[in-house]
Amino acid sequence: MSTDDQKVGLIPVTLMVAGNIMGSGVFLLPANLASTGGIAIWGWLVTIIGALALSMVYAKISSLDDSPGGSYAYARRAFGPFLGYQTNVLYWLACWIGNIAMVVIGVGYLSYFFPILKEPMVLTITCVVFLWIFVGLNIIGPKMITRVQAVATSLALIPIVGIALFGWFWFKGETYMAAWNVSGLGTFGAIQSTLNVTLWSFIGVETASVAAGVVKNPKRNVPIATVGGVLIAAVCYVLSSSAIMGMIPNAELRLSASPFGDAARLALGDTAGAVVSLCAAAGCLGSLGGWTLVAGQTAKAAADDGLFPPIFGKVNKAGTPVAGLLILGVLMTIFQISSISPNAAKEFGLVSSVSVIFTLVPYLYTCSALLLVGHGHLGNQVKTYVGITLIAFVYCIWAVVGSGAEEVMWSFVTLMVITALYTFNYNRTHKNPFPLDAPVKNGQ
């Protein structure tokens, strides 16, 4: 267990949640939404309602159960060790696979200043170096990594908040309305196409609860950080992407590789574009620290319960799962190097997409877990949280429906493989014969 001086307070963990949510995607969102048009504002409204509902689910369940591990801990408590094991493996995979995709984007922004980074071999080596830097910072301790991420998130917020607040001085209503709906679809179809982009934008809402073991006063701070992080991300997303849609004509915005950079150059000149690239790189690379932290924490929580190899639960004097973090570093390095060829890179793109779906399954389990764990503990808020949970359910399922068929298929295959792995894990940790004569209780 982490010592009190190593634990982190409310502001750093809130910024970690916001940084993990926004990550790299925020800087490309306006270009991705340009294929739909200004009507995307309605998609944002639907998405934010769903994301806030999900954040309130995590906030409430973490106030009832502050066990470290987040979704893993809730699934295990509500549904038993099998779904706990499944949740941990899915989430652990999603965290470190997502890091590999994120570091490539972050280093890509740095290529604005160092063109040599566009060379595949140099890019790969640089990515590996950054991955290990953040593994090392995590080993130093959670307080160090949250400080680094707080600085990185603050830097990333400079162009986002700048455009969100001051971009409106260059906003043209006619530019925005001229591309109100360029999707070729009706109103409902256009909003649905927007949701396929925006629903993914709040992945990371759960990260404060996963890191509960390293947070001071988790029953108070985790719920506040969860909802606060979502609200910060929501305001940044809507104001900045809407402002850019009114600054840059739709035809140009669709082709933009750096919408925030283009908007900054339009408003303040070329130097501003360089500043945006630097801030974007900081935001992407800084979020690596937070995702590495939660990957290590969910694995440690499961290992402590006998549902993951014991090595992931070994900690140093500060309570840091050093061995688990080193294993993460090795796995990320292997995958990073193996994705250097064009064919492998294409396959890894599929793996990255599948890993995002991996996070939705724990979300669904957590929604169900709240209604089970909260049974008899929600008082006069029962109806309120049933409604909130249903909204969060729809949010997650809609995100899965909007995914590609191939991604969903491989996610299902992974679930089947994890089922087989669980039997081996059970036999490894239980030396006695399976209790065939044990009575099965109703409701269990």
UniProtKB/Swiss-Prot annotation:
Site features described as Periplasmic (proximal) gate, chain residue numbers: 200
Positions marked as site (Middle gate): 291
Keyword Transport in record: yes
Top-level taxon: Bacteria
Topology class, membrane: Multi-pass membrane protein
TM stretches of this protein: 8-28, 37-57, 97-117, 121-141, 151-171, 195-215, 228-248, 275-295, 320-340, 354-374, 385-405, 406-426
Binding partners and assembly: Homodimer; each subunit has its own individual transport capacity.
The protein's name: Arginine/agmatine antiporter
Upper classification of the organism: Bacteria, Pseudomonadati, Pseudomonadota, Gammaproteobacteria, Enterobacterales
Gene: adiC
